[in-house]
Amino acid sequence: VVVGSDEVYSKEESEDSEDQEKPVTEEERQAAAALMAALTGGGGEDDLRSILMYGDVNEERSVEMIVGIISLSEQKPKEGQERIDDMKIYVSTYGGSADDMMAIYDIMRLAKDKCDIQTVGIGKVMSAGTLILAAGTKGKRKITKNCRVMIHAVSAGSVGPIHNLQNEMEEIQAIQDAYIRCLVQETDLTKRQLRKLLDQKVNIYLTAEEAVEYG
């Protein structure tokens, strides 16, 4: 899912890198700067093209994300450029709604027609957050050394008449199939590999290095 430098892991560099502890990395500094800019209204031009996906993936947060992504993707290219500058999305979440995840994902795919999207995983990228991280432009997806990634099967709770429950199960399966299809498209995993992982019926936790290996 990731490419980067220093302690921000890349698929190509991870095979040769040594496990060394370093101070704060450049990507972590940039994430802190983007957060401060968002909170204070300050920051430079690059900060203005950064979006934070921090917290639960829910309807309120997805609206903020979608508005931000559309706004940045609709800007005009600089003189002499065919495409507008990259936008950067920092992701740190325990997950949330599959529907809102898909809404963000679809908007990111549309936006990539106009600009590349850099995604950076910081802290934790779990459940619904994994597809958002993976949806960045290939070659521009990053993850910090100590970030943890978790994937699992789609889950839901429902009560009611048996026919309603059967209908709900069909919908959950449809969401699961869509989730797998999207992850296959964005990573190096095959559909068979993903189904095998998700069929374990447990949360699958990955280190930054393992996430890189999965693509």
Where are these regions (language model features)?
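Terminal-region recognition feature
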Residues: 1-215
